[in-house]
């Protein structure tokens, strides 16, 4: 499911994190244990670029293949931010966002649980030594074979939003606990809305609760998802209010007391996260302050993944048309850059002119030109950037793309024989500058 991980020699990872998290098992050690290795590179945060240059010059002189750098320090920082802003909400990381094994391992070591959407994702998480009680099978419409597998391995918490799903679960996994997935009335203007596909409408809540009750299934709570990427935090307010109404409806039907609220995903790091956390806590206080025993979970994906990964690509071709510069790189829309199409992402590139301008590899102060950057495949759709300003570069120079952890390699293909799954990941641990 994920590519190879390369660990570059450095200090003992347990020592690196000791002062950061204060004893106990080291998340970095857990991450580096993948493939039986135990070392990462400790860096100041502003030294990541130098680290990437060292990889380019020392490790990839001949291959010149694209690679990722996973900054474990950024992951630790993001988990600290989560625990500070939402201390009572336990994250179930959305595996679909980025299943890199070292990344999942460090999240697990720091206490994250996992949101899986398929048998394959469940198998993958279990293969990392993570117990099934730390998984929510958060797909409201599952193949029967996947439900059978979940029952077999002990994944006992799942979502539903249709009567047919009730019948499948009753038949194949009657001990499962259910979360009724509801549709938020506002999708938050998210780049990737979830409402058109998933979530019970208000008028469907009562029949769906009754269906589960008649099937003698336990409905433990409610889930929702306001959509992914740049969602309006106000959408949480209405969704949490609607969830409270479902709790009340279940109580009126004489069902067992609901104990779980899943506030879904849609969280983005930075200022938007701060705003979202305030909105979520405000709504929880307003609607669930009388539920002290309530377990609250969330399904963040991009919050943890997006800024932790940086992608480096090689320029493999060049064409000049007047002032226009056109470059081909060895990753594109059918690979890591599929986020441009499917996640509606905007990517940014930084040059590393290791061949053409070694005395000024970042090309600081250099003249820039309107530039088009193409991916490597033969499809004209495979265009990463248009009308983008870049300096004069040459074949075998590099373009580096930050913030490439969310819905990138995870959804890439091997179209035209360009093997996305073969892109390697190097590990580093950065400290704040």
From Swiss-Prot:
Its EC number is 4.1.1.17. Coiled coil: none annotated. The active site is at residue 378. Keywords: Alkaloid metabolism, Chloroplast, Lyase, Plastid, Pyridoxal phosphate, Transit peptide. The lineage of its organism: Eukaryota, Viridiplantae, Streptophyta, Embryophyta, Tracheophyta. GO terms for biological process: alkaloid metabolic process; nicotine biosynthetic process; putrescine biosynthetic process from arginine, via ornithine; response to jasmonic acid. Involved in the biosynthesis of pyridine alkaloid natural products, leading mainly to the production of anabasine, anatabine, nicotine and nornicotine, effective deterrents against herbivores with antiparasitic and pesticide properties (neurotoxins); nornicotine serves as the precursor in the synthesis of the carcinogen compound N'-nitrosonornicotine (NNN). Catalyzes the first and rate-limiting step of polyamine biosynthesis that converts ornithine into putrescine, which is the precursor for the polyamines, spermidine and spermine. This is Ornithine decarboxylase 1B, chloroplastic. Its cofactor is pyridoxal 5'-phosphate. It comes from Nicotiana tabacum (Common tobacco). Pyridoxal 5'-phosphate binds at residues 228, 266, 299-302, 407. It catalyses: L-ornithine + H(+) = putrescine + CO2. Induction: Accumulates transiently in response to jasmonic acid (MeJA).
